[in-house]
Amino acid sequence: MTHNTDLNLPLFERAKALIPGGVNSPVRAFRAVGGTPRFITRAQGAYMWDANGQRFIDYIGSWGPMILGHGHPAVLEAVQKAALEGFSFGAPTEREVELAEEIIRHVPSMEMIRLVSSGTEAGMSAIRLARGATRRNKIIKFNGCYHGHADSLLVKAGSGLATFGHATSAGVPQEVVQHTLVLEYNDVAQLEEAFTLHGPDVACVIMEPIAGNMNFVRASVPFMRRARELCTQHGALLVIDEVMTGFRVALGGAQSLYAQAIPGFKPDITVLGKVIGGGMPLAAFGGSRAVMEQLAPLGPVYQAGTLSGNPVATACGLATLREIAKPGFYDALGARTRALIDGLAGAASAAGVPLCGDTQGGMFGFFLLPQLPQNYPEVLNTDGMRFNTLFHGLLDGGVYIAPALYEAGFVSAAHTEQDIADTVAVARDVFQKL
């Protein structure tokens, strides 16, 4: 099967005439890797099929939400029942309360929660809430971490710690990003210096505990510990963006793993998405009662949404969370994910190709490097041309990974040992050609 497959190409041409770049989210366009994107017609379990009918083992999982795989029976039943009752009411429902209870039961740092429709909306709202609760304007984020496409977060680093960021997108005024300071991930000294210079003005620090848009880079325990200490010391809020990691790497999210290493650790605000919607447009942000009660209608921080708490989306999310809360779920998922990375590493080593990887729960990443990077500049050392060859070799062999060098991958409960073995077999052949 060639890169420009018969039926995907004309679909892409039709799409490009009507939709900018032919896609509704840029990474789907294959611009980073070249070739024609696959237009998916259906999915089931661990598999997707494109317009040509080619089957792929799916390691994107809709960029993370499909932790149970596609078309899980319990989720389908819940969604079908909810759809028959009504698509949207613009009024409260019991299921919103049930979903909030389920999330809070597993993520105790979230004493209260607000449901929204996307990770971008949740991150944007969390920043507004942090600013409103602290009566401060400045925020600290980290190079390589992605928190959605809200204006104040589309920022790259300035020339130094005394210089705030520059917009990474046209259409974002400098006046919007002038309060955002961008630091290097896992750099404790830089974070300390930033608070020395700007501490009284910092509303929050926002970070991914595992940076999935750097492929897979963990926040070190000392870095996370110091971020918590500095926020507490200076009266800033620590915002943990678990849109990708929440319920994906552990039932309590990545923050539950850090709490095992850092006694008493908890963020002030948590941002969730992806898995909590089970594939439907649903996200959330939450935190302590004192902070969350700053939101309208109780407090002065405004936030609203026509489709927030959508009854079909909440049904999908609730059914998903109830399935993944069953005993042994994460042990099995984590073992399968580890087997994938170990298999890929072994296949690469046999071919003399440098590859290192990491996993947590159902999330993984690998780099064509001899050792794991700790920040964005180190991630950039990956061989992009070699990755593109690997990507297309896997795709032609029926294995669908992210069409971008810096994106994490995902294993679902539907992936079998045979799926992992088949993936490694395809990769073994491709590595021999790199």
Curated annotation (Swiss-Prot):
Q: Which GO terms describe its molecular function?
A: glutamate-1-semialdehyde 2,1-aminomutase activity; pyridoxal phosphate binding; transaminase activity
**Subcellular location, principal:** cytoplasm
UniProt subcellular location: Cytoplasm
What cofactor(s) does the depicted protein rely on? Answer: pyridoxal 5'-phosphate
UniProt keyword list: Cytoplasm, Isomerase, Porphyrin biosynthesis, Pyridoxal phosphate
What biological-process terms (Gene Ontology) are attached? protoporphyrinogen IX biosynthetic process
Q: In which pathway does it act?
A: Porphyrin-containing compound metabolism; protoporphyrin-IX biosynthesis; 5-aminolevulinate from L-glutamyl-tRNA(Glu): step 2/2
Report the catalytic activity: (S)-4-amino-5-oxopentanoate = 5-aminolevulinate
Q: Which family does it belong to?
A: Belongs to the class-III pyridoxal-phosphate-dependent aminotransferase family. HemL subfamily.
Quaternary context: Homodimer.
Q: Which NCBIfam families match?
A: hemL (TIGR00713), PRK00062.1 (NF000818)
**Name used for this protein in its record:** Glutamate-1-semialdehyde 2,1-aminomutase
Species classification:
Bacteria, Pseudomonadati, Pseudomonadota, Betaproteobacteria, Burkholderiales
Q: Gene name?
A: hemL
